[in-house]
């Protein structure tokens, strides 16, 4: 601090009127001697520094005026005693003094000019805060509501205050009385009238109350637009507004809302800001986007496709295939995947079984054993013995899914008892061809053999399905007979005891005959299955490989 106390007096002595650095006519920092400072800058004759300012600006390690770091004592002494430091200190204080003077002159000029303009023109012609002149009250209103006026208010008052022409008058009166404290008085002065801001544009009647000198007829389209909430002072301005983009956009939005109400769009969707296009299955967030989508090429194409298809879909179709084709076209036009499979796999499997029943029966010549020896057509593909179906196990229940017409069909088309045995014998004979036939078939191609075995397997499957259905229908018929017998027994119980004994003897004899018949049938079936097993064991390796690869067993 001793060094500082030694330096500061020298600095104060250097900043005196006699020193060349303190005179206004001396050279400045750039060395320009042609310009003199006293022509434009008032020079202070003496600079007096108090102790607090010295401590803030000049320290032992740093000079805030020059932004210089002082590490050593010799460096500090040479810096504070130098000419550059004295010149920068002088410029620093001159700059602060000029800024204060500029603020004072700006305040006084603004107040004087504001008072003169207010007296001469009026509140709708001039804004004293922004120094702006207006050509009409509408322009003045837009300025008072605008951003420039609000920014000026925030700069002066330090907070957001609504600015009106009445507050302009209060500001002018306060500035005339005390120009120095005008800023604080403006901040504390309340607004006398409500402002003409954007809320008065949305509410039609509020605008007349806010501006009593400029009343607007809301029913006159040349004075006010109800759709855009905008007011006009001339018919030309109204015409320009009606032909502008803003009015056209609002008009299109209103029209679109009316159309959406007519089509039955939910109010919740519109209130949430979601607009759905049912044809394209797209959700939009604004009505402008919805309007552009509805007018787009993609939507128009889809709409025309759906309309044409819906017109054609009202006709009566000749077949289900035509109706299904039109349904698929409509779904594809809407961008959806059509559902073409309406049945389950079980139904398809059952339909295949019913179709197999309708296939052609074997020729009657083969059933009775009449085979043409000249033409070897029946033995063309019988050189191999295909795999038969597994033996029927009577302990397992059979498939009871038999249509109601099966019993009547069986009674009408069932062959006699000996007919089934003749069919089995004929097929057994067909499976054992002569040596001549086997030699002819061995010379055939391998493709014919494979196709012949495949056809035989198909026939055998069909036969097995028919037999299983016949068995099921036979059981149903037996159940019906048993129920009839029970009814007869109940009727006989009401009659006399002698009649009951006689009837019971008859029924017991009939039951014994039925049991015998059932036993014979079971023995015959067991013999058939044994024969089929023996024939199945005679398969070759080629047939086994074919069955594994094609049939899966």
From Swiss-Prot:
Protein name: Zinc finger matrin-type protein 1
Entry keyword set: DNA-binding, Metal-binding, Nucleus, Repeat, Zinc, Zinc-finger
Pfam family, one: zf-met
Family matches, as SUPFAM superfamilies: beta-beta-alpha zinc fingers
Zinc fingers (Matrin-type), renumbered ranges: 61-91, 125-155, 223-253, 275-305
Record field: compositional bias (Acidic residues): 350-362
Skewed-composition ranges (Basic and acidic residues): 477-513
Biased composition (Low complexity): 431-453
UniProt region (Disordered), positions on chain: 16-36, 341-402, 428-553
Comp. bias regions, Basic residues: 456-476
Organism in which the protein naturally occurs: Xenopus tropicalis
GO cellular component, one term: nucleus
Keyword Repeat set for record: yes
Compartment(s) of residence: Nucleus
Record-level Gene Ontology MF annotations: DNA binding; zinc ion binding
């Amino acid at each position: 601090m001793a060094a500082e106390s030694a330096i500061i007096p020298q600095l104060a002595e250097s900043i005196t009127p006699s020193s060349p650095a303190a005179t206004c006519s001396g050279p400045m920092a750039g060395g320009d001697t042609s310009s003199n400072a006293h022509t434009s800058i008032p020079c202070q004759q003496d600079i007096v520094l108090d102790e607090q300012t010295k401590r803030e600006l000049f320290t032992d390690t740093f000079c805030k005026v020059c932004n210089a770091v002082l590490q050593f004592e010799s460096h500090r002494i040479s810096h504070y005693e130098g000419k550059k430091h004295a010149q920068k200190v002088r410029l620093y204080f001159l700059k602060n003094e000029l800024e204060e003077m500029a603020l004072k002159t700006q305040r006084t000029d603004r107040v004087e000019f504001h008072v003169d303009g207010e007296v001469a023109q009026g509140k709708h012609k001039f804004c004293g805060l922004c120094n702006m002149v207006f050509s009409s009250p509408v322009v003045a209103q837009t300025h008072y509501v605008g951003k420039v006026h609000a920014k000026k208010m925030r700069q002066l008052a330090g907070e957001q205050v609504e600015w009106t022409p009445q507050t302009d008058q209060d500001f002018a009166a306060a500035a005339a009385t005390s120009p120095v404290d005008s800023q604080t008085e403006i901040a504390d002065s309340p607004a006398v009238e409500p402002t003409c801001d954007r809320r008065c544009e949305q509410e039609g009647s509020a605008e007349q109350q806010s501006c009593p000198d400029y009343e607007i007829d809301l029913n006159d389209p040349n004075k006010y637009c109800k759709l855009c909430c905008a007011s006009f002072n001339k018919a030309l301005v109204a015409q320009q507004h009606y032909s502008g983009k803003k009015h056209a956009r609002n008009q299109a939005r209103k029209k679109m809302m009316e159309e959406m109400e007519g089509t039955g769009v939910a109010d919740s969707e519109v209130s949430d800001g979601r607009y759905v296009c049912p044809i394209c299955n797209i959700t939009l967030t604004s009505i402008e986007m919805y309007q552009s989508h509805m007018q787009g090429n993609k939507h128009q194409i889809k709409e025309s496709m759906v309309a044409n298809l819906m017109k054609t879909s009202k006709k009566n179709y000749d077949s289900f295939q035509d109706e299904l084709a039109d349904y698929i076209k409509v779904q594809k036009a809407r961008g959806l995947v059509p559902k073409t499979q309406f049945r389950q796999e079980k139904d398809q499997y059952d339909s295949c079984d019913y179709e197999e029943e309708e296939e052609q029966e074997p020729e009657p010549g083969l059933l009775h054993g009449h085979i043409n020896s000249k033409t070897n057509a029946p033995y063309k593909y019988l050189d191999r013995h295909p795999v038969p179906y597994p033996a029927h196990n009577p302990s397992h229940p059979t498939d009871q899914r038999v249509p109601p017409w099966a019993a009547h069909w069986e009674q009408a088309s069932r062959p006699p008892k000996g007919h089934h045995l003749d069919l089995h014998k004929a097929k057994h004979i067909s499976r054992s061809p002569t040596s001549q036939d086997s030699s002819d078939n061995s010379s055939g191609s391998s493709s014919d053999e494979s196709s012949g075995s495949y056809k035989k397997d198909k026939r055998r499957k069909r036969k097995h399905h028919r037999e299983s259905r016949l068995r099921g229908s036979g059981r149903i018929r037996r159940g019906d007979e048993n129920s009839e017998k029970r009814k007869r027994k109940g009727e006989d119980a009401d009659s006399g005891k002698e009649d009951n004994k006689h009837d019971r003897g008859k029924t017991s004899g009939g039951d014994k005959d039925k049991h015998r018949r059932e036993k014979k049938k079971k023995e015959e079936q067991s013999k058939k299955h044994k024969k089929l097993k023996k024939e199945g064991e005679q398969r070759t390796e080629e047939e086994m490989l074919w069955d594994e690869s094609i049939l899966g067993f």
